[in-house]
């Protein structure tokens, strides 16, 4: 994946990440129990979660889940509906006038594909959502994706590659890309 980086397990960087995740999980749990009309407390907690003040025009409906916080930036007039998940270690940049439907997942992190490396840390790459994008309910945006200005992502879509500006994309497509080898070098599925 383009721009992919890795954090190896059992390193100072991975320990700092785990500590930050634990803090943000506590903060988002508090955020999700606040009265909906307590805007000042909500805005204060969002500032703690994201490590900086958020735009006054940002609207995030609870419940909201985030794992890192420091990787997310928001433009003006952004609306994020209920039940969204932001795994933002790799960075999530959201432009102006973006609408994000309920249950959307933006995940910038994953694990190495190779079996021998899968449990030795995490990989991450940024997500960029340009101005005036609408992401429909329950869509999933994967690491390294840019969604071009003015585009629409249909409900339930899984977006694993860049979306050109002013496009409408829908659906999911699962395509076998390659076979994985086991630690012995055998190709999975070939032993039948």
Spans of features found by a protein language model:
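Flexible, glycine/small-residue-enriched loop-and-beta-strand segment within the central core
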Residues: 64-74, 79-146, 172-192
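Terminal amphipathic alpha-helical/low-complexity segments used for targeting or macromolecular assembly
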Residues: 1-57, 173-192
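Extended beta-solenoid/beta-helix repeat architectures
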Residues: 145-148, 163
């Amino acid at each position: 994946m383009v721009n992919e980086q890795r954090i190896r397990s059992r390193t100072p960087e991975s320990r700092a990440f785990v500590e930050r995740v634990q803090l943000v999980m506590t903060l988002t749990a508090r955020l999700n129990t606040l009265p909906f009309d307590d805007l000042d407390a909500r805005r204060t907690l969002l500032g703690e979660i994201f490590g900086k003040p958020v735009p006054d025009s940002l609207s995030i409906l609870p419940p909201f889940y985030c794992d890192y916080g420091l990787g997310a930036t928001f433009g003006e007039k952004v609306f994020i509906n209920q039940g969204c998940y932001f795994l933002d270690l790799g960075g999530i940049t959201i432009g102006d006038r973006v609408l994000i439907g309920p249950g959307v997942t933006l995940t910038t992190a994953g694990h190495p594909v190779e079996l021998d490396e899968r449990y030795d840390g995490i990989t991450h790459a940024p997500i960029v959502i340009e101005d005036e994008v609408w992401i429909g309910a329950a869509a999933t945006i994967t690491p390294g994706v840019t969604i071009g200005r003015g585009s629409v992502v249909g409900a339930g879509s899984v977006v694993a590659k860049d979306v050109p500006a002013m496009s409408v994309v829908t659906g999911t497509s699962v395509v076998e890309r390659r076979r994985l080898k086991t630690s012995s070098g055998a190709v999975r599925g070939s032993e039948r």
